[in-house]
């Protein structure tokens, strides 16, 4: 696919950055914000939508309720009745509010006089209450990226959702350990005009948040939601972008999807002379189960054995439309299939542009065409499944196909790991918000503002200069400044330097962990506690700094206790080093006799393989050089 001209397309992108705050307590109770894999029980919920304060039911909430799911919640040991929705929320976490106010100050936002906590209806099971508590803290402001001002619309403080553990067709299991962790949400204006600019803005906001020293790190602690539109399209919400580097690809693919959908609309209307009314009036749907009684298609056989039925739906003039690619490996037919999976919970759908295939023969395709009365330019969709679900599926298929005459549907999509997206649910509306009646309004006074000033992040340029003054090279200082481990670096440097150089700490965090990953290590196990265990051993002269790299490799590949691995790399004495070198020299005396001091590179490699960082590299080199110089030659 050729690259699109985003300025001509009128691309507009807004970001919603969600970041967990690193506070000791949750937003509305005193429970710990540490995730806990252990639990002492479960509770069960069925959730249903409620009317908003204006008497309406939100479409997204209605969509989730119609799934009829049961929700189970693991109760960790650090959980209380607030998370189970058996007790009213306590007062809002003052520390979390101060951090959000500090971010608002740095973004030049207008802080509200009084904070009102609202309930945002969410009944996908991620909140036991059926709603998420959220509150606007500031509005307006800006972030400057490469000289361009990107507007900030709102800054909010809200509670994070429960952590999903597993999911099946009928029930979803969550853990309550994440529910209620304070979360800052920063929403930008749709001022971003290229995919690459979106990544830079997200990075800049993420950097600002890290510079507060009060945000959590790791998978799931930060996510970016995108709002993307082009001229003639609509604002599409894309949820759950976990990796910063995926942002440009996702935006490119969404812009392409909207562009292709608008092209389909233009072709149907202006080139094929069709309209929604014409196609709708000539839709034909028939049960076609009898045509596939002797099929060789494994997919169809499986459904028929379960008592499923097959229906065919004719769409006048749609030949070639279902197979039209909207983004890499995702076609218009894929969009319809996504709708059916999400809205009717059926997976068996085929369209005329991909058949014969999947074990469906050309003879079976011709039989379908004959039964449905398919003309030369017509298309059809086959859908397979349970009779009751088929009713919903057929309705949704017709709705989505006919929407091709409108263009781009207003929907919420979910980001996939390959940079594409798929339909998630209808877009929520204004009917999902109403006031939280259990929490009184919170006045923003001088005391909370003064508290917030202690968290206002430094300017990145100022922070970079300070890192360089600590002895780091500009390159290493920049890596640490941009690293999610910046706060850990500062904490360890304050605690262990000057005895342990900040350069060693920074190199460990930025280079040695990457080295462990390159050697096949699972670096997710390298926690802050593991890093500190290693730095502490170095501080107490138990290990050499040259052993850190190998310790991390061994730990991330073996998963043995870190203390055991550190003990294996304990410093050797000078006497032991001398014995090792003498032994290797004696074993390689023939090479030394042949090459003399030129044999050094061979010998040092053998020595290092035995020493494995248990002595400082310089000491090993100097000792070997001296011994080789005085080694007797024949």
UniProtKB/Swiss-Prot annotation:
> For this chain's UniProt record, which GO biological process terms are given?
glutaminyl-tRNAGln biosynthesis via transamidation; translation
Provide the E.C. number(s) assigned to this enzyme: 6.3.5.-
Q: Which family does it belong to?
A: Belongs to the GatB/GatE family. GatE subfamily.
Species the sequence originates in: Sulfolobus acidocaldarius (strain ATCC 33909 / DSM 639 / JCM 8929 / NBRC 15157 / NCIMB 11770)
Task: Indicate what this protein is called per its UniProt record.
Answer: Glutamyl-tRNA(Gln) amidotransferase subunit E
Cite a GO CC annotation: cytoplasm
This molecule's function is given as: Allows the formation of correctly charged Gln-tRNA(Gln) through the transamidation of misacylated Glu-tRNA(Gln) in organisms which lack glutaminyl-tRNA synthetase. The reaction takes place in the presence of glutamine and ATP through an activated gamma-phospho-Glu-tRNA(Gln). The GatDE system is specific for glutamate and does not act on aspartate.
For the keyword Metal-binding, the answer is: no
Give the first-level EC class, as a single word.
ligase
Q: Which GO terms describe its molecular function?
A: aminoacyl-tRNA ligase activity; ATP binding; glutaminyl-tRNA synthase (glutamine-hydrolyzing) activity
PANTHER family to which the protein is assigned, alphabetical: GLUTAMYL-TRNA GLN AMIDOTRANSFERASE SUBUNIT B MITOCHONDRIAL AND PROKARYOTIC PET112-RELATED, GLUTAMYL-TRNA(GLN) AMIDOTRANSFERASE SUBUNIT E
UniProt keywords (A-Z) are:
ATP-binding, Ligase, Nucleotide-binding, Protein biosynthesis
Q: Which reaction does it catalyse?
A: L-glutamyl-tRNA(Gln) + L-glutamine + ATP + H2O = L-glutaminyl-tRNA(Gln) + L-glutamate + ADP + phosphate + H(+)
Q: What subunit structure does UniProt give?
A: Heterodimer of GatD and GatE.
């Amino acid at each position: 696919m050729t690259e699109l001209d985003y300025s001509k397309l009128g691309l507009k992108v807004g970001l919603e950055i969600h970041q967990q705050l690193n506070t000791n307590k949750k937003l509305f109770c005193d429970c710990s914000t540490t995730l806990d894999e252990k639990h002492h029980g479960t509770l069960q919920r069925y959730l249903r939508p409620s009317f908003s304060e204006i008497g309406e039911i939100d479409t997204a909430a209605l969509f989730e309720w119609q799934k009829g799911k049961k929700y189970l919640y693991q109760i960790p040991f650090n959980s209380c009745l607030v998370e189970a929705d058996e007790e009213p929320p306590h007062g809002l976490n003052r520390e979390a509010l101060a951090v959000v106010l500090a971010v608002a100050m740095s973004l030049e936002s207008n802080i509200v006089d009084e904070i009102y906590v609202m309930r945002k209806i969410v009944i996908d099971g991620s909140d036991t209450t059926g709603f998420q508590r959220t509150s606007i803290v500031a509005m307006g402001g800006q972030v400057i990226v490469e000289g361009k001002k990107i507007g900030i619309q709102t800054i909010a403080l809200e509670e994070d959702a429960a952590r999903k553990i597993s999911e099946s067709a009928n029930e979803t299991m969550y853990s309550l350990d994440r529910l209620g962790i304070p979360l800052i949400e920063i929403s930008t204006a749709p001022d971003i005009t290229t995919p690459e600019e979106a990544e830079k803005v997200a990075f800049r906001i993420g950097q600002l948040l890290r510079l507060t020293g009060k945000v959590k790190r790791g998978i799931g602690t930060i996510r970016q939601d995108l709002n993307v539109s082009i001229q003639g399209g609509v604002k599409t919400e894309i949820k759950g972008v976990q990796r910063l580097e995926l942002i440009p690809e996702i935006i490119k693919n969404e812009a392409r999807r909207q562009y292709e959908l608008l092209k389909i609309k233009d072709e149907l209307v202006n080139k094929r002379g069709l309209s929604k009314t014409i196609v709708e009036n000539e839709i034909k749907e028939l049960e076609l189960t009898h045509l596939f009684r002797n099929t060789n298609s494994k997919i169809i056989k499986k459904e028929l054995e379960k008592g499923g039925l097959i229906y065919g739906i004719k769409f006048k003039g749609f030949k070639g439309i279902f197979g039209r690619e909207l983004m890499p490996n995702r076609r218009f037919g894929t969009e319809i299939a996504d709708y059916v999976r999400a809205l009717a919970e059926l997976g068996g759908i085929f369209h005329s542009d991909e058949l014969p295939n999947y074990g469906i023969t050309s003879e079976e395709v011709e039989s379908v065409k004959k039964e449905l009365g398919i003309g030369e330019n017509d298309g059809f969709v086959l859908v397979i499944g349970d009779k009751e679900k088929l009713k919903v599926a057929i309705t949704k298929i017709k709705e989505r196909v006919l929407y091709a005459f409108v263009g781009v549907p207003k929907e919420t999509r979910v980001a996939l790991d390959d940079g594409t997206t798929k339909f998630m649910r209808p877009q929520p509306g204004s009917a999902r918000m109403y006031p939280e009646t259990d929490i009184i309004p919170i006045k923003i006074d001088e005391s909370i503002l003064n508290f917030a000033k202690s968290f206002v992040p430094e300017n990145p340029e100022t922070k970079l200069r300070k890192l360089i003054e600590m002895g780091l090279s500009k390159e290493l200082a920049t890596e640490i400044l941009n690293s999610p481990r910046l706060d850990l670096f500062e904490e360890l440097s304050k605690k262990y330097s000057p005895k342990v150089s900040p350069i060693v700490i920074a190199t460990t965090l930025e280079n040695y962990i990457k080295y462990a990953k390159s050697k096949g290590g699972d670096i997710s196990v390298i926690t802050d506690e593991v890093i500190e265990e290693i730095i502490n051993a170095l501080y107490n002269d138990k290990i050499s700094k040259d052993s850190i790299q190998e310790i991390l490799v061994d730990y991330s590949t073996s998963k043995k206790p870190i203390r055991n691995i550190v003990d294996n790399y304990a410093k050797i004495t000078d006497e032991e080093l001398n014995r090792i070198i003498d032994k290797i020299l004696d074993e390689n005396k023939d090479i030394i006799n042949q090459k003399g001091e030129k044999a050094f590179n061979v010998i040092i490699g053998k020595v290092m393989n035995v020493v494995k960082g248990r002595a400082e590299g310089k000491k090993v080199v100097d000792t070997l050089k001296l011994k080789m110089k005085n080694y007797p030659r024949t």
